[in-house]
């Protein structure tokens, strides 16, 4: 069974990242590798996590012309990752090209999800880049585009999960960042929820970083979260 919890490995060096990984159990959580760590350590680090039997969410948010994104997704799949993402704002052709690039992997193909609206965004920031939709409208619009393109789901704030499920179906995966424990500050993310709130809203997978990575006992925090969920 795939764990509902995805731990974000937001580190700037390999030693700290691996120290945390050694305290975690692949049966209890998946791992997210983002741009910072991937740029620093490259594909070999991802392969090492896969070798340790962790499910890896490669969070590189590909956004380019369709052919380039298709090749990037195929390269990511070669690493053995469980999930990867692209920016939905890249458009229908780009999303379809990404999906097509993974067909050769058959039933073993990674999950392909699309980023809707970053959880750091607020209404004013959407307007500043020329988007007149509200945050829920934009997230839902992009989720429906991803669904039309045949993707498996989206990355979305928990605030938009319920409407996305209504529009795209219960089987359309929602991966939710911006998850904070009740005693944690918002940090640099604006639209946050606790794990329990996000699950009630219908989130399928929760991405949690600092509350786990900065904990004195990460394994204990993960265990407590799983009990609560």
UniProtKB/Swiss-Prot annotation:
Top-level taxonomic group: Bacteria
Entries under NCBIfam families matching the protein: PRK00230.1, pyrF
Pathway stated in the Swiss-Prot or TrEMBL entry: Pyrimidine metabolism; UMP biosynthesis via de novo pathway; UMP from orotate: step 2/2
Keywords: Decarboxylase, Lyase, Pyrimidine biosynthesis
Membership in a protein family: Belongs to the OMP decarboxylase family. Type 1 subfamily.
A matching Pfam family: OMPdecase
The protein's enzyme class: lyase
EC number(s) reported in the record: 4.1.1.23
InterPro entries: Aldolase_TIM, OMPdecase, OMPdecase_AS, OMPdecase_bac, OMPdeCOase_dom, RibuloseP-bd_barrel
One Gene Ontology molecular-function label: orotidine-5'-phosphate decarboxylase activity
Residues where substrate binds: 10, 32, 59-68, 119, 180, 189, 209-210
Gene Ontology CC: one annotated term: cytosol
Function, as annotated: Catalyzes the decarboxylation of orotidine 5'-monophosphate (OMP) to uridine 5'-monophosphate (UMP).
Catalytic activity from the UniProt record: orotidine 5'-phosphate + H(+) = UMP + CO2
Listed name of the protein: Orotidine 5'-phosphate decarboxylase
Alphabetical GO biological process terms: 'de novo' pyrimidine nucleobase biosynthetic process; 'de novo' UMP biosynthetic process
